[in-house]
Amino acid sequence: MSVIDQNAIAVGPRISEADVGDYLALLKPRVMSLVIFTALIGLLIAPGHFHPVLAITSLLCIAVGAGASGALNMALEGDIDSLMSRTANRPIPRGRVTRQEALAFGITLSFFSVLTLGILVNWYAGALLAFTIFFYVVIYTLWLKRWTAQNIVIGGAAGALPPVVAWVAATGSIAPEPLLLFLIIFFWTPPHFWALALFRSDDYARAGVPMLPVVAGPDATRLQILLYTILLVAIAAAPWPLGYFDAVYGVVSLALGAGMLWFAIEVFRKRERSQSLRANRKLFAFSILYLFALFATLGLEAVARMIAPLIW
């Protein structure tokens, strides 16, 4: 990146005109899709009848809140993004959107999502969505990410809250089921992101981000990945014997957990650079499949319970 581009990021001027695609990129669409999916599962497993219009409204508000968090995150991390190859093409490092514009965009969407959810659905869900945005933007982005190697561990709480917000939107209360979903995502986050950090450690080191591989080294990170994966597999399987989720979920969680554990062990075992790189990438890719399949199973079980009375 040129000196001119670096200076542009520091002071925030526009280098070229932004288009709709640039503002969509600020929303972090991939992260939004995961948030929508996990929130949808939170809605589906919630008890009772939730009006479809309110359900759609809740999902949209949660999605917009997640997008707002992404925009604010990019506005506050323009300096970091410009130094990392993975993020250098984002709108702010490219000079397509200024930091001030991203901040205004994110703040506007934050207020819109929280107020709409509170007014149209319930204020418990609105308050929890506001807390989720605050936690991600202030606690994680401004503090944890820049100052501690445990940034992903603690900060993972923000990414784990959407299904809880959805459940509260549907019921107006809290229960063990959404808390179990929270714990699954919370303990899934470290192995997922540390696998990424292992093969992107040079990027993080260059940007001065204290990710675990940068601070503690790859060996310590591999051990932490394995330990968190063991906890994840145990926590994900627990709802079945505890009677919260059905046997189909239990079998799927054990099968997926075996796969997750296998890839984590491979990451722990393989230290040679080329083999380690492949193992890290495989764990990262499988972890996405793991979470999707696990939550999809819950969603399918919930849908089956809904339509069963209509069939029989």
From Swiss-Prot:
Subcellular localization:
Cell inner membrane
Membrane-crossing residue ranges in chain numbering? 34-54, 56-76, 119-139, 152-172, 179-199, 225-245, 248-268, 283-303
Key words of the record = Cell inner membrane, Cell membrane, Heme biosynthesis, Membrane, Transferase, Transmembrane, Transmembrane helix
- UniProt enzyme class: transferase
Q: Which InterPro entries match?
A: Protohaem_IX_farnesylTrfase, UbiA_prenyltransferase, UbiA_prenylTrfase_CS, UbiA_sf
Topological type in the membrane: Multi-pass membrane protein
Q: Which domain of life is it from?
A: Bacteria
Gene Ontology terms for molecular function: protoheme IX farnesyltransferase activity
Enzyme Commission number(s) of this protein: 2.5.1.141
- Give the record's GO CC terms: plasma membrane
Kindly indicate whether the keyword DNA-binding belongs to this entry.
no
Q: Decide whether keyword Cell membrane is in the record.
A: yes
Would you kindly state one Gene Ontology biological process term found in this protein's UniProt entry? heme O biosynthetic process
**What's the further remark here?**
Carbon 2 of the heme B porphyrin ring is defined according to the Fischer nomenclature.
By sequence similarity, the record places it as follows: Belongs to the UbiA prenyltransferase family. Protoheme IX farnesyltransferase subfamily.
| Protein name in the entry | Protoheme IX farnesyltransferase
- Which organism is this entry from? Bradyrhizobium sp. (strain BTAi1 / ATCC BAA-1182)
Q: Which gene encodes it?
A: ctaB
